[in-house]
Swiss-Prot record:
Recorded family membership: Belongs to the FtsB family.
Keyword Aminoacyl-tRNA synthetase among record annotations: no
Gene name of the record: ftsB
Alphabetical UniProt keywords: Cell cycle, Cell division, Cell inner membrane, Cell membrane, Coiled coil, Membrane, Transmembrane, Transmembrane helix
Upper lineage: Bacteria, Pseudomonadati, Pseudomonadota, Gammaproteobacteria, Cellvibrionales
Its membrane topology: Single-pass type II membrane protein
Transmembrane domains' residue ranges: 4-21
Residue ranges annotated as Cytoplasmic topological domain: 1-3
Domain of life the protein comes from: Bacteria
Source species of the chain: Teredinibacter turnerae (strain ATCC 39867 / T7901)
Record-level GO cellular component terms: cell division site; cell septum; plasma membrane
Subcellular location per the Swiss-Prot or TrEMBL entry: Cell inner membrane
Residue numbers on the Periplasmic membrane side: 22-91
Protein name (Swiss-Prot/TrEMBL): Cell division protein FtsB
Length: 91
């Protein structure tokens, strides 16, 4: 009977140790849940960015207006007959 109690105490101690310390412990689970939440937030931010980029690609494929806007803003291009004015801020 004493052996049975001793063996049961050892098993309970092993299970308690695993519950509180090491891989699969409560602290480990909480850390992983936080990491999952952070990763899901990052994924949502990246999904929104991908939607914006896909819309921009679609606009560039279908219309000349988007291409013209991109050429003007990124490359400083102007149309024939236009005059370019650059306003420099003194600050």
């Amino acid at each position: 009977m004493k052996w049975l109690v001793a063996v049961l105490v050892v098993f309970v101690a092993m299970f308690q140790y695993r519950l509180w310390v090491g891989e699969g412990s409560i602290a480990d689970v909480v850390r992983l849940e936080r990491e999952i939440a952070r990763q899901e937030a990052d994924n949502e931010r990246l999904r929104e960015r991908n939607k914006q980029l896909a819309a921009e690609v679609d606009a560039l494929k279908t219309g000349d207006d988007a291409i013209e806007e991109r050429a003007r803003s990124d490359m400083g291009m102007i149309k024939e007959g236009e005059t370019f004015f650059m306003i420099i801020d003194d600050q």
